[in-house]
From Swiss-Prot:
The protein's assembly and partners: May homodimerize but does not interact with BicD. May interact with eEF1gamma; The interaction is probably indirect.
Name used for this protein in its record: Bicaudal D-related protein homolog
Similarity remark: Belongs to the BICDR family.
This protein's record includes keyword Chaperone: no
Disruption phenotype: Viable and fertile. Post eclosion discolored, short and brittle posterior scutellar bristle macrochaetae; this phenotype is more common in females than in males. Pupal to adult lethal when combined with mutations in BicD.
Record-linked InterPro entries: Spindly/BICDR_Dynein_Adapter
Gene name linked to the record: BicDR
Length: 620
């Protein structure tokens, strides 16, 4: 168990000494007149107080054995000690005041001393309690200190572990640094070798540079000699400059005139570009018109193919009717041969009485005659429909239409009966003539259509050729203007070169020279731009020429094809007319002479159909 602190012991000793001093003073004041009993009491009380004070002193002495480590404890109860010391100071000051103001009464003094002793005892008791409390606080601090020591030991252990880890890491780092050091040493050796090699190369290079230096010194000497020569030439040029200085203003004026000419040439070039643009637009329009004409040609070819299909259908119907006609003619020939073997003419039979040729014994018409008449009516209706369609399409081939109308009138005049009903005077050769008429009508219709198409294409080609000629003339004019501008540009270049030579001689007038140089540079830039643009225009003109030549070649080929087609059409029309005349002559001869067999008309029709098919194949 620890002892109380020294400060509390000192305060208790101070209280005891103050009380004893007060008692001594009182004893000295009272003197020796006091009785023995009172002296005994006095001796006892101070002795008791002295014992108490000794006890306190021993406590204080024991408290002096405390360690210096407990100095932190004084800070904890410093405020309480200050309060106790203040109370004791008040008590001591009160005792001293009573000592000075004491009464001469001894019993009062004794009572006062007893009360003081009791007070001192109470103070001692309070001090002991305070000491016990301080001891408890000290034990608590010791426990806290031990816990802190344990924590510090743990931290120390952790730090030792960290130190071991750090030592291992440092060892590894040392090994790595040693390996890096060896690598750096190797690199240093390689660098040393490289430096030695570089020094060798440097020495070689220095030797070469020395040789070059000697050679350059020789060249410098030569250049110095040439410099002297050039200085002499410069002096001569200066003399020439002084001589030509008077004509500098004239050169400036010539430069201004050159500038104006350049502006004019640029304006002309822009005009040429505009015209070239117009020519390109015209070329594009020509190409578009050419495409339109090609589209029209394709459309006409498609229309021709449609007409050809229609013609094939009509020809098939015609062949079918021709076959029926042949069958009927054979049957009629057989009937006439059996009835009148002496006569072989179908026309003679048709001119005979109706009761003999067209009717049987019962009064009914002959079946062969009825079939032949129906075939003839079908062919006539087909011819009439083709004539109507031909009149609706166009008014071409008026001679053919007039001929057909005259034939129709002759036929219609013989078709009326007395009572107004349709009656056909069926004779020999009418079916063959009707089939021939149908073929001629079809051929004439197609010939008229193709003639119209040919005229349209010819007009279109002529218009395109005229446009191409105009564009070609425009291109020739543009080329002539370009050549003129080239000549003008060449003249400007020559004047520019002359002005440049004159300006290079003028070395004194720096401002004028710089101004002329700037103008010259601007003129050079404009000239280069003009040359570039002229080159572009030339290239474009060449392209336009090539395109126009290609288009002209295509037009020429197309015109040749059209001419060939026209010639073929003329030949075909001539052949048709010749065949028509021959057929008419044959028909007239057949009417006047003996009748030919019916198969001859069918063969003639078959020949005409084959010729028409060949013509349609040629059209394709």
């Amino acid at each position: 168990m620890h002892k109380p602190k020294l400060a509390n012991a000192i305060t208790a000793a101070a209280i005891a000494s103050s009380i004893s001093t007060k008692n001594n003073n009182n004893n000295s004041i009272v003197g020796g007149s006091s009785s023995s009993s009172s002296g005994g009491n006095k001796s006892k009380r101070p002795r008791q107080f002295g014992q108490y004070s000794i006890g306190v002193g021993t406590g204080a002495g024991a408290g002096g054995l405390l360690r210096s480590d407990d100095s932190g404890f004084d800070h904890l109860d410093y405020s309480s000690l200050i309060g106790d010391s203040i109370d004791l100071e008040h008590y001591i000051s009160a005792m001293e005041a009573r000592r000075h103001d004491q009464e001469p009464d001894v019993w009062a003094q004794l009572q006062q001393k007893e009360s003081d002793i009791l007070l001192a005892a109470e103070l001692g008791k309070a001090l002991l309690e305070k000491n016990e409390e301080l001891v408890k606080q000290q034990e608590k601090l010791i426990e806290d200190y031990s816990s802190k020591i344990e924590k510090l030991e743990q931290e120390k252990h952790v730090l030792r572990q960290k130190l071991a880890i750090a030592e291992d890491e440092s060892d590894q780092r040392v090994l790595e640094l040693q390996s890096d050091l060896t690598e750096l040493k190797d690199k240093l050796q390689t660098q040393d070798t490289a430096i030695r090699q570089a020094e060798k190369e440097k020495t070689i290079l220095i030797d070469e540079l020395q040789h070059q230096n000697t050679r350059l010194t020789e060249q410098i000497q030569e250049a110095h000699a040439t410099e002297l020569k050039l200085s002499a030439q410069i002096q001569e040029l200066k003399d020439q400059y002084h001589y030509r200085n008077s004509s500098l203003q004239e050169h400036v004026n010539s430069l201004e005139s050159i500038k104006t000419e350049l502006n004019l040439t640029t304006g002309k070039r822009q005009e040429l570009e505009r015209r070239l643009q117009i020519a390109q637009e015209e070329k594009e329009s020509l190409t578009s018109s050419l495409e339109e004409s090609s589209d029209r040609i394709h459309m006409l070819e498609r229309h021709a193919r449609e007409q050809e299909t229609k013609l094939e259908t009509t020809l098939q119907a015609l062949e079918r009717s021709q076959r029926e006609n042949n069958v009927l003619s054979e049957r009629l020939g057989a009937d006439t041969n059996s009835s009148t073997p002496g006569r072989k003419s179908l026309q003679f039979e048709m001119e005979c009485d109706e009761d003999d040729g067209s009717y049987t014994e019962t009064g009914k018409p002959n079946q062969m005659f009825v079939e032949a008449r129906s075939v003839y009516i079908q062919l006539k209706s087909l011819v009439d429909s083709l004539k109507v369609s031909h009149d609706d399409d166009s008014g071409l081939n008026s001679d053919i239409s007039l001929e057909l109308e005259s034939m129709d009138n002759t036929i219609s005049s013989s078709e009326r009966h007395e009572d107004g009903h349709l009656a056909i005077e069926f004779r020999q050769g009418m079916l063959s003539s009707m089939s021939d008429e149908l073929t001629r009508l079809l051929l004439n219709l197609d010939a008229g259509n193709f003639k119209k198409m040919l005229d349209q294409t010819r007009n279109l080609v002529l218009e395109q050729e005229d446009e191409i000629k105009r564009s070609h003339q425009l291109i020739q004019q543009l080329e002539a203007k370009v050549t003129v501008t080239d000549v003008e540009l060449q003249n400007v270049k020559e004047e520019r070169d002359q002005a440049r030579g004159d300006l290079e001689d003028n070395t004194d007038r720096d401002e004028l020279l710089s101004k002329a140089q700037t103008e010259r540079d601007a003129a050079n830039d404009r000239r280069t731009k003009a040359e570039v643009e002229l080159a572009k225009t030339r290239v474009e003109l060449m392209q336009a020429n090539s395109q126009l030549l290609e288009s002209i070649q295509q037009k020429v080929e197309l015109s040749q094809q059209l001419e060939q087609w026209q010639m073929d059409m003329h030949e075909l029309i001539d052949e048709q007319m010749r065949s028509k005349l021959i057929n008419n002559r044959r028909a007239m001869a057949a009417e006047s002479s003996a009748p030919s067999p019916p198969s001859s008309a069918a063969a003639n029709l078959a020949k005409r159909v084959t010729s028409y098919k060949l013509w349609s194949l040629f059209q394709r």
